[in-house]
Amino acid sequence: MSMRSEYCGLVTEELLGQSVSLCGWVSRRRDHGGVIFIDLRDREGLVQVVCDPDRAEMFKAAEGVRNEFCLQIKGVVRARPEGTTNAALKSGKIEVLCHELIVLNPSITPPFQLDDDNLSETTRLTHRVLDLRRPQMQHNLRLRYRVAIEVRKYLDAQGFIDIETPMLTKSTPEGARDYLVPSRTNPGQFFALPQSPQLFKQLLMVANFDRYYQIVKCFRDEDLRADRQPEFTQIDCETSFLSEQEIRDLFEAMIRHVFKETIGVTLDEKFPVMLYSEAMRRFGSDKPDLRVKLEFTDLTDAVRDVDFKVFSTPANTKDGRVAAIRVPKGGELSRGDIDSYTEFVRIYGAKGLAWIKVNEVAKGRDGLQSPIVKNLHDEAVKAIIERTGAQDGDIIFFAADRAKVVNDSLGALRLKIGHSEFGKANGLVESGWKPLWVIDFPMFEYDEEDNRYVAAHHPFTSPKDEHLEYLETDPARCLAKAYDMVLNGWEIGGGSVRIHREEVQSKVFRALKINAEEAQAKFGFLLDALQYGAPPHGGIAFGLDRIVTMMAGADSIRDVIAFPKTQRAQCLLTQAPSEVDERQLRELHIRLRQPEPKA
């Protein structure tokens, strides 16, 4: 006979009067007047088990049961007495009268209660196996599974083929640092773990597989930010003979399908499309959160000749910018609030935060309250009020600096105010889901330290057709056929049309100061393949971890990954990374150099 006939959480009134065999863990044990109640838990939920003292041997076993004991229960399903049902449980109308109780494995006392919502992340990750038993973690990982299923369903229906690409590959040090794997059989040589399957999926297009996908692990040895992992999972896709618009339409439909089928959310029938330049101008970010209703107003040209040097200096600097955000009803904010926001923007490099409270627009400058108004001439004041659309009771915040500092600091302030209690109370943020595409990214960014251009996306992204000439004459003007899908302020997917002609790829390498010899050494296999009739192709990669985090409403991507790393790229459960013994190092022809002692 099978050890289990039903899952605990699926025992309902349909099984009334039937004998069942259940397996699971003790969530709670209660002794009520000589009758023992056990909440037995498995992955499907809870069921209440009643242990009556009439069965002496079974009852004695039940008396010794404690939380997290692993049990097998045999008994009969019966209705709960009137007034004791639990509407929160699928099994809440029934209970199981226990006839036989077998302790499959006892448990030592857990280091925490599974229903404790105030556990530190260190505790949770150190005892991850127990943490994963908690209902929320069970829910999150099953949601992740369902997302993966729906992705596969959609892509299979669209003719995509799941093809695995190598985990041990060639190091191509462009972008983030690679994780290196020493080769024992080739002393002094190393594999790299892939940052993405980028080049292999392009080669698959050249090889006539037409449509490829893979749900794949990727690795980046980068300085970890708040919500990054050294290993992460991509929904990686590539397709041939489609235009940029067709690629976006195809994968927009995939995301709509996944959201509808997994969490019942209907996303916009057509996602809005925004140029990168517009996103930076209006929101200071290439991943704008469209739920927040605040926008930038550019004032650079209006304050070039004011006496206020904080404004006029960046306004007359090549890469300077002066911008503002108007906060409706922001006049209610206290000086303490303003000081707090001032300290907040300093995190992003701003030197301070100028502001004007608009008490009465009709009175002109006399209706404004601010320490900076006296340093602004009438034309500048008029431009500020008119361009921002300021009304009585508003406040206007300003940032003036290099464009990057303005965008970063004012963009962060926009989100902070929008999502604050003040913002919610005053309708500055909407609920729900706000997807969009951001397109036409710069092809290159200039690296001041290395004194050269670097690829803004990656060096295999195609320039826009009309910008091909700029590759050799003015790379800064060159825009790429690149696109990001943004949802509620997070980039959830990014891709591009790829370069499919060898001569164009070589021009891009030259623009990046990668000479022909270096290009052949690093990417010769790609350049060779492009000469064999490579088709036009493009693709996209979605961050599975990020998508599931948003769907689950989780605080961190670590809450949707079974065994994540910490911000220091450590696994607290297994204590990885760890030292290895000298013999292993000798086999790999590696000698460790001890770090220099600190002075």
From Swiss-Prot:
The record marks 32, 83 as: Important for tRNA non-discrimination. Keywords: Aminoacyl-tRNA synthetase, ATP-binding, Cytoplasm, Ligase, Nucleotide-binding, Protein biosynthesis. The keyword Ribonucleoprotein does not apply. L-aspartate binds at residues 174, 220, 457, 498. The gene is aspS. It is found in: Cytoplasm. Belongs to the class-II aminoacyl-tRNA synthetase family. Type 1 subfamily. Its main location: cytoplasm. It comes from Paraburkholderia xenovorans (strain LB400). It is an enzyme of class 6 (ligase). CDD domains: AspRS_core, EcAspRS_like_N. This is Aspartate--tRNA(Asp/Asn) ligase.
